[in-house]
């Protein structure tokens, strides 16, 4: 029953108080099961059907899909349940205690992005879900901050095809219709060690990597010349060399060298296309030194994303907000949800607060966010 639902600020407080950290380091990684249980119970109280989906390949993590209404199409509101780890030495407040001060709600996940579910639940108090003409879906995903495994798995397995979706990442209520992707790779070169006094008796992996880097930088220039998307502040795919390590002593021929790099592809560029370009760039080194160069993913790749600018979702949201859609350089789960239906990224709070100590959401977002959620539900599910 709706009268069982706690007040907005108590929902928010309970979400923040329930840890759900995602981390590649196992010691820091946490299950989101308790948070999913909280959300599932609240949506059941509102009359939703709730499905909890274990996410394979994770450490006891789950997605939740709450649904109400009949028929095809409808609206999907989505967000992730996990947060990044916190640096205890840099926080001046308890990350798991919601505190309000000077027009700001502080806590880990207030902006990125547990708070979005509090806004959805609060808005639904005034919605009679039995009268919806089209279905309404609420998706809560796992592991966005690391592998995006939850959104990937949901998109791969669901039969849902809503009319449109909104992901409530912190965009300061500015609608986002496109962003770049992210690919991170490790280039490893295996040489042959030996004493530095006789270089011919070894294969210096650093020297081979020097050759490989030259070809990678040429690829970087080619990407900048061949691909362009004017709406982005950096209107071409970027390629960054972020980390390199090789060798263990000045008098030893380096036996192994490893380079970590990332590429930020534009929307429309496929992951297969980029992998092919990288392999082509490194082919001269591989052909000269067979079996010594390998390329491995550091993290699962994320494609670029774009919602068609003329889609009804864009037109409706721009009209409701009085603001044009934007494009951004950071990544979200949108590429995976976009495979199901046209998707916008739109939510309260600033992206500048994401992953920061003393994370907060300004209280000025409370009223307009609640109104926006109510309006999009009425537009896409009542008509």
Swiss-Prot record:
One of its GO terms (molecular function) is zinc ion binding. Zn(2+) 1 binds at residues 80, 112, 169. Zn(2+) 2 binds at residues 112, 145, 355. GO terms for biological process: L-arginine biosynthetic process. It comes from the Bacteria. It is found in: Cytoplasm. InterPro entries: AcOrn-deacetyl, ArgE/DapE_CS, Bact_exopeptidase_dim_dom, Peptidase_M20, Peptidase_M20_dimer, Peptidase_M20A. Pfam families: M20_dimer, Peptidase_M20. Binds 2 Zn(2+) or Co(2+) ions per subunit. Its main location: cytoplasm. Its cofactor is Zn(2+); Co(2+); glutathione. It is an enzyme of class 3 (hydrolase). NCBIfam families: AcOrn-deacetyl, PRK05111.1. Homodimer. Belongs to the peptidase M20A family. ArgE subfamily. This is Acetylornithine deacetylase. It comes from Escherichia coli O7:K1 (strain IAI39 / ExPEC).
């Amino acid at each position: 029953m709706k009268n069982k639902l706690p007040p907005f600020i108590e929902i928010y407080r309970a979400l923040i108080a329930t840890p759900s950290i995602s981390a590649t380091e196992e010691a820091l990684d946490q299950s989101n099961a308790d948070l999913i249980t909280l959300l599932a119970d609240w949506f059941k109280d509102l009359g939703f059907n709730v499905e909890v989906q274990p996410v394979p390949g994770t450490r006891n993590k789950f997605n939740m899909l709450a649904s109400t209404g009949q028929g095809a199409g409808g609206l999907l509101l989505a967000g992730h349940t996990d947060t990044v780890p916190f640096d205890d030495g840099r926080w001046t407040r308890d990350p798991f205690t919601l505190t309000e001060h000077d027009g700001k709600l502080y806590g880990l996940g207030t902006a990125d992005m547990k708070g979005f579910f509090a806004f959805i639940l609060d808005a639904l108090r005034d919605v009679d879900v039995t009268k919806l003409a089209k279905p309404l879906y609420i998706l809560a995903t796992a592991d966005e901050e690391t592998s995006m495994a939850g959104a990937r798995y949901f998109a791969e397995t669901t039969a849902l095809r809503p009319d449109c979706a909104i992901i409530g990442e912190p965009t300061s209520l500015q609608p986002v219709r496109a962003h770049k992707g992210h690919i991170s790779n490790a280039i490893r070169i295996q040489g042959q060690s030996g004493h530095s006094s006789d270089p011919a008796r070894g294969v210096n992996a650093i020297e081979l990597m020097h050759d490989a880097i030259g070809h990678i930088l040429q690829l970087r220039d080619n990407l900048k010349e061949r691909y362009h998307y004017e709406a982005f502040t950096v209107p071409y795919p970027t390629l960054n060399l972020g980390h390199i390590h090789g060798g263990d002593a000045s008098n030893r021929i380096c036996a192994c060298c490893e380079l970590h790099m990332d590429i930020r592809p534009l929307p429309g560029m496929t992951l297969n296309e980029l992998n092919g370009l990288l392999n082509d760039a490194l082919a001269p080194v591989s052909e000269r030194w067979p079996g010594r160069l390998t390329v491995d993913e550091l993290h699962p790749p994320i494609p670029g994303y774009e919602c068609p600018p003329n889609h009804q979702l864009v037109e409706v949201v721009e009209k409701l907000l009085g603001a044009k859609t934007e494009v951004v350089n950071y990544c979200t789960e949108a590429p995976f949800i976009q495979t199901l239906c046209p998707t916008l990224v739109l939510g309260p709070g600033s992206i500048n607060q994401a992953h920061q100590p003393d994370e907060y959401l300004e209280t000025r977002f409370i009223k307009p966010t609640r109104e926006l959620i109510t309006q999009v539900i009425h537009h896409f599910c009542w008509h």
